Amino acid sequence: MFDKSRLNTLPESPGVYLMKGSDGTILYVGKAKSLRKRVRSYFGAAGESRYHIRFLVARVAEVEVIVTDTEKEALILENTLIKKHRPRYNLDLRDDKTYFSLRMDMNEEFPRLTIIRKVRQDGARYFGPYSSAASAREALKQLYRLFPLRHYPLETCRRRRRPCLFYQLRQCSAPCHGLISPEEYQGLVQGAALFLDGKNRDLLKTYRERMASAAANERYEEAARYRDLIRAIEVTVEKQKMVTTGGDADVLGIHREGSSLSLALLFIRGGRLIGSRSYLLAWELEDEEAVSSFLNDYYSREVFIPDEVLVPLPVADSAALAELLSERRGKRTSVAHPQRGTKAGLVKLAGKNAEAALREKQKREEGAEAVLTELKERLHLRNLPRCIECYDISNIQGTYPVGSRVSFRDGKADKGGYRHYRIKTVAGADDFAMMHEVLSRRFRDSPAKDEHPDLIVVDGGIGQLNILTAVLRELQVEDVDAASLAKSRVERDMAAEELTRSTERVFLPGRKNPVILRQNSAPLLLLARIRDEAHRFAITYHQKLRGKDTIRSILDTIPGIGPKRRKELLRQFGSLRRIREASRDELAATPTIPPTLAESIWKSLHENDEGDTP
């Protein structure tokens, strides 16, 4: 139990406090303008009266404080400590997938747009964010119809004898083949940037002036092109919802029900709503701390920082946060809690999105519970299969043999439970022996019962199931249900003289005949999805190992490439395909690769290409 007499000894300076349990485990990390006032608020009468505080305080045995010079330093330190220690009661966004953005380097000879994950301070222009690669690709697809920018690296384009297919589709202007002047191409680049920035009024005004000028000078084909472009832009813009008069903003909304907290972030770019993202979290503490922690964590990542961030409630450290964001961005960014007007309406809209996301999650959980209950009943399992693990083996005639483990919790993939296994003890194509090794290693590596799944599924028939039950028996694992899922088979109907496909079959220990689940039933679809995911996870790892050997063998044929330089090339580019797509200058920019060797690498990888090399 924490000694409250220590509260008066705490400094009144800004800093970070770490709440620890009796075993020294860090339970919570927070920041404060005044450490004494902030920590005292947890242990005073007001703090003890709040349910969300009582449960944390009861577990605190010690409070460690770290003094900083400014609130901004406290923000940075808090984020660093949370990422390092992952305290149980702090907001946890570590499973959050990175957003996608469009990047355009204006210093390139003919700038093009690429889809990237990380926003860097490298002088390039960034547009977005987009919540998925698919939405980013769709944005690019629309943009190419309006502004036919090049699609591929210049080195790739110039190796071809003729323009690419996108030129024939009028979605590329083929600058690499001189079919558009640099000045005209620069006009396309500027137009695309204005369009992505949401500055459509300026863009349309410019194009109308150019159309009028072309018509006045009897350049009617040029005027017609501008006319068609103006119409296409107007049609596209009509589909986008205008929510403010202009500018970029991120709008945060919040909705809480008990310990379930939902946050929704709306992305406003150029005054238009371009997307949103929801975060569903288990959070017991105050909403203000949730908002503050979320903003600090989210914007510490390599993401786009807008002109302003609108929040649903007052945040004590908003000034320090605004200063930190402005410093990271290189331009002023404000953090505001609007009380009225259009911006307050946007915050309210974000709150509605947060509530809708929580409702959707609750419905999914109710549906998952029903599916798991039905699965338990149909397979006569001892446990409700909240945690299901599935295993698969992948190899080609015993080469590059690997195993995979995927984990699903409450019907959803739990990526933290995924594992790859390189087969170590089996020679030749013996899938049963490989499965035995993988399962044995899984339970030897984590013998604690609290780490065991409720159900293990193996991909295969009765033979694979026998291996699973043998391993469980050998290692005295008694609290795990077992099953195998055999794929459907093609069967011949001799009477009808036709081929039919059998249903998926579930084999269980102690049963001679498999259980046949109703086709397209929710339990069968869940098992099939888990089995297919295990297969995908195994085969991609197998292909990766084969690919590494392929890369090694190809690069080893190039004079001057040894293990160190090969490793550096792979670290820099990631794959043989990307090494092959790289230009000479990009290869030469790789550490330990001089220009002469870069030239040799480029020629070796392109010696069979058609057409003249540049």
Swiss-Prot record:
GO BP, one annotated term: nucleotide-excision repair
Pfam families: GIY-YIG, HHH_5, UVR, UvrC_RNaseH, UvrC_RNaseH_dom
Ranges where the GIY-YIG domain occurs: 12-91
Signal peptide: none
Matches recorded under SMART domains: GIYc (SM00465)
Any GO MF annotation of the entry: excinuclease ABC activity
Keyword DNA damage: yes
Disulfide-bond pairs as recorded: none
Localization of this protein: Cytoplasm
Stretches that traverse the bilayer: none
Family listed: Belongs to the UvrC family.
Function of the molecule: The UvrABC repair system catalyzes the recognition and processing of DNA lesions. UvrC both incises the 5' and 3' sides of the lesion. The N-terminal half is responsible for the 3' incision and the C-terminal half is responsible for the 5' incision.
Name of the protein this chain belongs to: UvrABC system protein C
Organism lineage: Bacteria, Pseudomonadati, Thermodesulfobacteriota, Desulfuromonadia, Geobacterales
Gene name per UniProt: uvrC
